[in-house]
């Protein structure tokens, strides 16, 4: 089969490729990479390191070291291993969207060597449908197998893959033999209709299905099938520390009070949590709590999801990807039949759909880089200038959730940086989208409060003790000397950031 480097024996082919017309299209990763044209818009599977292209994109990065070729790369979210780094370092990227989490690519973005479009994750497909961004030329989709009609059985994520395959002129499929052939039945793939008069998305509970368990494709589009045998890059799960434990305790106490006043029950409403150690730790806190029969309607299902399944606290989880540690991944694979009926993976325009988030009454828990005394949140930029990763799905949930919660440490880097400041250096989520703010110091419930009331609650409950006096003094001076609905002293609003730049500390 065209010098394919990975052995494709008869048994493997019978298991993985059930559509006979594809058998003549098995090629190597290098051959597939050679099919990518300069200036192509490539839509590749992958969402938070799960279900991504593990051989074709790395092979294209290698090719770009020797040839003057570059592409626009659109994925679901971040890619695993060093793929984004390899592409950036070989100058293989013209544009990148909608999310990334790689240090080398981040450097290229901040040097404007790669044009980065930081999008709400629910909007990428919408913009492709409407023609707001250039259409997909070539889709690269990871699969566990191909069914009798040539359709793709996805792996550990869906992301934007279903629409990429629908819109692309050409498709390359990576069949990953590390994923068991029985890893199917958990996917719910649907391609949205165009405007006008689009149908509603008929999801009323996290368990509802509206699509198919495979990605439907036109077999004539398929250029090649590449076999790989590489697992997803494992997530690094940090043990909860005193900061994340405190944040979790504050949130659990808040939920207890909401139950006591009759606003919620001990099953709460469907939970969403962003990626990362803080959100994962917060969810872990439910494990030893009174909260039972929980459900999730989220983007990324992390280790905490499976810990809560095993502890009996969580009944069902819907997401767009499964991004877990090596140990948790093996537990999932070994016990897949046990977990199968508790999981759904959806396209990210469905998992993050504002329509569904509002209908289900999601409790959204996302991580902030910093927030200010009036409740505005910065999720993306360091000191207002340098891109960190991207807004991801936090905005999809924040504006539409039943409860919009943002969490972060009160201070970091030996307390040289305060994460609560007079004015955020970059706005991702305005005060209008934020209900609850939580740090290790405490929780600020901002619902129904005017700006000055919010400032009092945030300063009292969320600011680190080493910064509280100065931030309170700033606020009181702003009230006295400037006044207004949202008092600010523009000459001093960013003094914490300028001090950090000049001295290496906000103190």
Which stretches of residues belong to each language-model region?
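Conserved alpha/beta enzyme-core scaffold
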Residues: 4-507
